[in-house]
Amino acid sequence: MDNNRSMHVTLLPFSDVQAAIGKAREEWKETTDFNTAHHSEEEIDAVIPTGKEDFPFRHVMSSFFPTRFGHWVPLIAASQGASCWHVFEIPRYLAQELAGLYARAKDSDVGHSIVETLDDVISRLYTSMRAVRGLGDILEESAAEKPRSFLMPFNAAMGPARECRVFCPPGKGRISAISQYRWTEPFRFQSTDNANDEALVIYEGARAIYDRIMESAEKMQDSSIRGKMKEEGFTFDVLRTPSGEVQFVEINPFGAMSGCGSCLFNWIRDAKLLYGMEQQVRLQFAV
């Protein structure tokens, strides 16, 4: 990984974020200032033209396959200090039924709590739009594959308010930017007076996790995983725990055409930064 990049921390007044959200609500639409996704090929190609020396790739809808949780669960578990986990297959008929009812079940109605029974697992699945979409993606990708559900040891430190999203553009072999994950509220710094120091800890932790991700990808038997990651890029989420650790949470697709939210960035407005065309790595937080 290229370590010769300067880091710049931007602390946005949270009042600016609130104003953007309020304006969008008055107009009965989603804000376009932050957390955009699902842009058209024409939109992103106008800012990052394809076929150029600095971007020899095509803008595509990123593949779901390389970012599957199952590929990365050993690395995620190790990062969070977990030595074991459980996995079970969901019969396709049940997955189809769950998908018809309402993707890791992070947005479930019950929130961040312990799963103790099979009923708890089912409840997490059918009350989570993300989980339902994840089931649907697998059912569409394969006519025979059974979706799998992973049960990890409960992590009391887990919380979206302390998570960050890390952007890794195609072909650059590095991190281009980092944003707080839950962009609709101020980031939980231990002290805003030391925000720059805490941001540096997050950056260094994210770089170490990036290196481990790429090392793991190189060791995988399916070479298409690392090939897709290099051609399409990827994002991953990290958790800054109250004790100061930086843990790996999950990996997601990259790009303006993907469904991956840009958090405090905008995929088009900030395309040069996110796609690695700028020299600096920017970390952006609302305070």
Residue ranges and their predicted role:
Residues 229, 242-287:
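C-terminal active-site "lid" helix and adjoining low-complexity regulatory extension at the edge
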Residues 84, 164, 168, 260-263:
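Generic recognition of cysteine residues
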Residues 18, 80, 96, 180, ...:
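Residue-identity detector for glutamine
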Residues 109-200, 205-229, 233-248, 253-254:
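Phosphate-binding site of ATP-dependent enzymes
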